[in-house]
Amino acid sequence: MDPGNHSSVTESILAGLSEQPELQLRLFLLFLGICVVTVVGNLGMITLIGLSSHLHTPMYYFLSSLSFIDFCHSTVITPKMLVNFATEKNIISYPECMAQLYLFSIFAIAECHMLAAMAYDCYVAICSPLLYNVIMSYHHCFWLTVGVYILGILGSTIHTSFMLRLFLCKTNVINHYFCDLFPLLGLSCSSTYINELLVLVLSAFNILMPALTILASYIFIIASILRIHSTEGRSKAFSTCSSHILAVAVFFGSAAFMYLQPSSVSSMDQRKVSSVFYTTIVPMLNPLIYSLRNKDVKLAVKKILHQTAC
């Protein structure tokens, strides 16, 4: 289709989660609450780990990095969504849309690989405790984290670069609550075959590979837990692992539903619901899941509260 026969989209309207006016206030209050919990929880976790010397270990180094990613991941999307709920205008400019897509993709990809790094760290700690300090040295942790962000930036740059090559002119309504890949591809007047192929290939690498790493790590971890003779110790370990596995399953399951299938397979409304989980729910839950059953975190909180009171 010749781009010269069409006017390009310079400003778009985000369809949002619901078009019903009576739901906008309720959705605003719901997501405002989620946003506050997410920001407080993740920034609180980063601050707590930074201030507590006994938490300066590889496990908490990765947890701090995950909290930073979750904070950024959420704030790229939620503030704009809240403004749209409040004003009911839902307008986003083309540069703002591309910037949101680029930043969102960085942190979404980075989160996949950070969760895999954390699972590997847990595997080494439980299955090879004598070699833990050698394998998970500060040097290795640093470069693992750098690698996570490099993969995020590389994947996001590829997606956004190919998106910028498309001529968006079909409509100015984006059937989503933020600028994501498949909703934007639906606006294109030119062929999206390469873009959709890239989404499937890169999603397979950035979702399936980390998911398989996590699965393998937890298989070995569970096998080690089963060898624990103490019933109390075994149940405690299973309780902790089950909460971690649940958070990971929700994140990767919803992300896979969104990206690991062609755009024609499921409706955009189904994809909207799925994306709520990995863009807002999981970033809110992660600090709670990784801290509620953690004695080290509870001890650090008590110490800081005691120092503040004194």
UniProtKB/Swiss-Prot annotation:
The keyword Protease does not apply. The keyword tRNA processing does not apply. Glycans are attached at residue 5. Residues 47-54, 121-139, 218-237, 293-310 are cytoplasmic. One of its GO terms (cellular component) is membrane. GO terms for biological process: G protein-coupled receptor signaling pathway; sensory perception of smell. GO terms for molecular function: G protein-coupled receptor activity; odorant binding; olfactory receptor activity. The chain crosses the membrane at residues 26-46, 55-75, 100-120, 140-160, 198-217, 238-258, 272-292. It is found in: Cell membrane. Residues 1-25, 76-99, 161-197, 259-271 are extracellular. Signal peptide: none annotated. InterPro entries: GPCR_Rhodpsn, GPCR_Rhodpsn_7TM, Olfact_rcpt. It is a multi-pass membrane protein. Keywords: Cell membrane, Disulfide bond, G-protein coupled receptor, Glycoprotein, Membrane, Olfaction, Receptor, Sensory transduction, Transducer, Transmembrane, Transmembrane helix. Disulfide bonds join 97-189. Odorant receptor. Belongs to the G-protein coupled receptor 1 family. This is Olfactory receptor 8G3.
